[in-house]
């Protein structure tokens, strides 16, 4: 069972001025005396298998370069840019770092994840590749290699140009023990065998295996700003704790817009390098995004009702139908807009999960019987009031990998009893529970 392919949201349009933010307590300021440039070069030299320096003349002549420019636009030209979007977060971020200790926090997407651009992104509707930082790319499946050309106008949020050196430095960064990120260390160690620089805007990445989705392993990566991490060393977590890493996206955080423990405000770059490019020009419309800490769910709801927060995702039928019904004066009066919309993205794999190594559950007929005995539609109709749809598989929403021919097993007591009988449970005990010849009850605890 999963959420229907859609969201319910409450939209509240308010006109408000953002109060001034300040009082940022930065733990570290840039130290111009530190420069790890030589260490980086030495690392490249020590790994000639991983880092290759070539020339444009070394590029294969038969490469087929793609630009992804034939897909439909994203967003609407009628959307007005400007204003402030007010959002709540459950807790103040423990760090502004994108990598390393404590960096995987609940509001990470709002802080930077929503705005960071990889080399290439999938179109949200067609799933086809469209340009991010890359201007074009070429896939050499036979040699497990992807070639990438950087858009020469691409810049970091601090206005420094993005170059192939930042692509190479990403490998130094994510392989480094300084960042204290074992997953990243492991991923870059095991999935890639080489990165080759051809010029300031052209490079290639070689993967270890030619998987069906091999191209994504290169295209969905992104650069790391080498100039920003010249101070990278053993004190990385502390040194960069409250320093916002430049990225290629539309929003940035200024030190003056950090009110520790209270709020963080992001600002849109008015001269963002991609602001007039297809696929990006109708996105990222607010000038500012105000993230205020509201820890308690009831307080977040009240803040929304007051107009302090612009939108609230509704996760329960009780909230949608009982707490804020269509007859509510604010809804009926047009002050709050309730909206339901659908998408075709990956679904959360909600369901009843069984440990097949446990006693009784290690019998396939028992597991199949449970499938047929579980009345999910009753749960959907009564508990979720019909606002859910059952998953067809445990991983729906992956177009190239989800099998459209798989159907969930229906609620069918007769079939359930057949499978339970095949597992030896043919009689019922005094309490009505099925038992086998040894008197063992077919009962489980969730």
Regions found by a protein language model. Name each.
Residues 135-180, 204, 300-303, 360-362:
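Aromatic- and charge-enriched surface segment that lines or borders ligand/interaction sites
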Residues 18-20:
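C-terminal motif of bacterial Sec signal peptides marking the signal peptidase cleavage site
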Residues 267, 361-446:
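Append "and occasionally in soluble cytosolic enzymes with long acidic Gly/Pro-rich linkers
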Residues 104-105, 110-117, 121-125, 220-288, ...:
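Gly/Pro-rich hinge or "lid" segments in bacterial periplasmic/extracellular proteins
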Residues 78-80, 184-233, 239-241, 250-257:
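Surface-exposed binding/hinge segments that line
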Residues 52-73, 82-141, 172, 246:
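N-terminal lobe/hinge region of extracytoplasmic solute-binding protein
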Residues 176-184, 194-197, 254-265, 292-358, ...:
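Extracellular/periplasmic solute-recognition and catalytic clefts
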Residues 82-91, 135, 145-148, 167-170, ...:
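Short, well-ordered beta-strand elements
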